[in-house]
């Protein structure tokens, strides 16, 4: 099965290429923290030889509580992203929540992300597709892997085939998510690159009454399980002080654990992709 290659700058993204990292922090808390986090990601990924794209959100529009921190907003967020790109020369990925944001974000960011909760919103999908930017499509917690073909079709009909799919877990009763490992293979049949968002797969939605809980201690186990499926890359959020992060701290990797964590994932990715394909159908 031929696998599509998506190019972002000099990075090639495909299920049969070396893993790419979409990594950073959940939400922009400050310019200084964005610089601190990106600097460590750049140091580690350059040392390990992992192609890297910086990730953060300028607005978390789907927080559990109306009083929860959402981020600096569109204008300030784009200024911070421009500063990060200038300082480190890395591509940027961020999510958009409204059709009117798509073109503005695509002028600054290299990849625009369709949030899982909004992945069936046709107006948003079409607006994002029409920018011509690479789109990272998060699989909704309530969608089966095979249903992602409909979102891909919407983008393609709007003239965009620069697409990436991203697994982030499926609803399993209340306040819980599970990851169906067979779903990766189903989505890979569409031939687009598939990523694994291990951070949000660790969520316990609404698990802390007014915010999401998480299972940070299991991040390495779950990441290894996902990346054993020969994927295009990993989506990861880290924080210098997860217990005091303004969003999704319970799921975030400690920033000082980034290097040993990624070293194991890179070794696993290389091993898995060294195996010949065994046809069992």
Swiss-Prot record:
Keywords: Cytoplasm, Lipopolysaccharide biosynthesis, Transferase. Its EC number is 2.5.1.55. Pfam families: DAHP_synth_1. Pathway: Carbohydrate biosynthesis; 3-deoxy-D-manno-octulosonate biosynthesis; 3-deoxy-D-manno-octulosonate from D-ribulose 5-phosphate: step 2/3; Bacterial outer membrane biogenesis; lipopolysaccharide biosynthesis. InterPro entries: Aldolase_TIM, DAHP1/KDSA, KDO8P_synthase. It is found in: Cytoplasm. GO terms for cellular component: cytoplasm. Belongs to the KdsA family. This is 2-dehydro-3-deoxyphosphooctonate aldolase. It comes from Pseudomonas fluorescens (strain ATCC BAA-477 / NRRL B-23932 / Pf-5). The gene is kdsA.
């Amino acid at each position: 099965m031929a696998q599509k290659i998506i190019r972002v700058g000099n990075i090639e993204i495909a299920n049969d290429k070396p893993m790419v990292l979409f990594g950073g922090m959940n939400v922009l808390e400050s310019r200084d923290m964005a610089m601190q986090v990106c600097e460590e990601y750049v140091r580690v990924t350059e040392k390990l030889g992992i192609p890297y794209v910086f990730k953060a959100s300028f607005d978390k529009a789907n927080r559990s509580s109306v009083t929860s921190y959402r981020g600096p907003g569109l204008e300030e967020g784009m200024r911070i992203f421009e500063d990060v790109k200038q300082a480190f020369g890395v591509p940027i990925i961020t999510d958009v929540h409204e059709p009117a944001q798509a073109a503005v974000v695509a002028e600054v960011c290299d990849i625009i992300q369709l949030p899982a909760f909004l992945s069936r919103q046709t107006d948003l999908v079409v607006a994002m597709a029409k920018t011509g930017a690479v789109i990272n499509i998060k699989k909704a917690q309530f969608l089966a892997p095979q249903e992602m073909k409909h979102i891909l079709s919407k983008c393609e009909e709007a003239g965009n085939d620069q697409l990436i799919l991203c697994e982030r877990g499926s609803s399993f009763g209340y306040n819980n998510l599970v990851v169906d490992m067979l779903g990766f293979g189903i989505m890979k049949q569409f031939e687009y690159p598939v990523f694994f968002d291990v951070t949000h797969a660790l969520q316990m939605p609404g698990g802390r009454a007014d915010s999401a809980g998480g299972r940070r201690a299991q991040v390495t186990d779950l990441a290894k399980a996902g990346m054993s499926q020969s994927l295009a890359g990993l989506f990861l959020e880290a924080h210098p002080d997860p217990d005091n992060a303004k969003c999704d701290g319970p799921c975030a990797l400690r920033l000082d654990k980034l290097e040993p964590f990624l070293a194991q994932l890179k070794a696993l990715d290389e091993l898995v992709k060294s195996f010949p394909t065994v046809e069992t159908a």
